[in-house]
């Protein structure tokens, strides 16, 4: 078994079974492994941004990571815009980026670049494989990193000689820490805020926009009389007949400020404190009304 096969086996063993790929010469051993190792479905895309965008959408809808396979630094660069979106949405993605053979890097061939520097701004985890024997373990670590709450983009850089050289057995899946629970004291504090009957808005985001989250928020609003709103742009929100459909916070700051006008307590449930998307003349960065207390 070579390094490429050990990587794909590690991925399949950890439950990653879809790869959105736009490969080149430095990824050919991995392309062969996609064919020889059962359990991984390869989807060819003709542009790297399609690979990263598809992986982002897949993660948002399934809650599990897909693998991307991209060609060197320029190929990664072509997919960075959608990795930015994925990072903002906390989407679990595992990028596998082929690189020059370790002994060929010094030649400074035309497509050689600093892949770590390109990957780092859009990734929550970056590693460069150093040997064929480390490849399976590195892949298992990348998958676990991508799934670590709240989810992140993990990028693994794989030199071509580490792919084609012999490797050891596939690595076992790593343990992934569970999502942290809200402390009991925080729940008690929010309950006190709601019982105070001051003008209160709950701003929903993240997992609060699941079916269970929306229904729970609607029950809280019905009992307390608070207003429900969602972030302007959500990673995912459940929709359908009978599902609560809170108002979205408007995009433009004037409208957002008007929507939150009069709110004295703003409770953030999976959401960030709202800010304007750009700096506008004469308007604030923060959309929290003046004098409003933010509770988390």
Question: Model-predicted segments: where are they?
Answer:
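N-terminal alpha/beta PP-like core and its mobile active-site loop of ThDP/TPP-dependent enzymes
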Residues: 1-296
């Amino acid at each position: 078994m070579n390094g490429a096969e050990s990587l794909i086996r590690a991925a399949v063993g950890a439950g990653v079974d879809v790869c959105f790929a736009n490969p080149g010469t430095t990824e050919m051993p991995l392309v062969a492994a996609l064919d020889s190792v059962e359990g991984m479905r390869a989807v060819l895309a003709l542009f790297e941004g399609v690979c990263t965008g598809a992986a982002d959408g897949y993660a948002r809808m399934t809650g599990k990571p897909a693998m991307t396979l991209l060609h060197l630094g320029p190929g990664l660069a072509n997919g960075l815009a959608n990795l930015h979106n994925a990072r903002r949405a906390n989407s679990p993605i595992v990028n596998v980026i082929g690189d020059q053979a370790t002994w060929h890097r010094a030649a400074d061939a035309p497509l050689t670049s600093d892949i770590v520097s390109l990957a780092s701004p859009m990734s929550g985890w970056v590693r460069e494989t150093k040997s064929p024997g480390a490849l399976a373990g590195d892949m298992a670590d990348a998958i676990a990193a991508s799934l670590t709450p709240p989810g992140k983009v993990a990028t693994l850089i794989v030199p071509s000689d580490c792919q084609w050289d012999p490797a050891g057995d596939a690595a076992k899946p790593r343990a992934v820490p569970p999502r942290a629970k809200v402390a009991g004291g925080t729940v008690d504090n929010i309950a006190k805020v709601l019982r105070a009957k001051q003008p209160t808005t709950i701003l929903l985001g993240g997992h609060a926009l699941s079916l269970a989250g929306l229904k729970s928020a609607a029950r809280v609003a019905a009992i307390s009389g608070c207003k429900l709103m969602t972030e302007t742009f959500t990673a995912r929100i459940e929709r359908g007949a009978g599902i609560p459909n809170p108002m979205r916070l408007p995009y433009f700051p004037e409208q957002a400020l008007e929507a939150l006008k009069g709110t004295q307590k703003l409770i953030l449930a999976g959401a960030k404190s709202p800010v304007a998307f750009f700096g506008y003349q004469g308007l604030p960065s923060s959309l929290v009304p003046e004098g409003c207390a933010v509770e988390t």
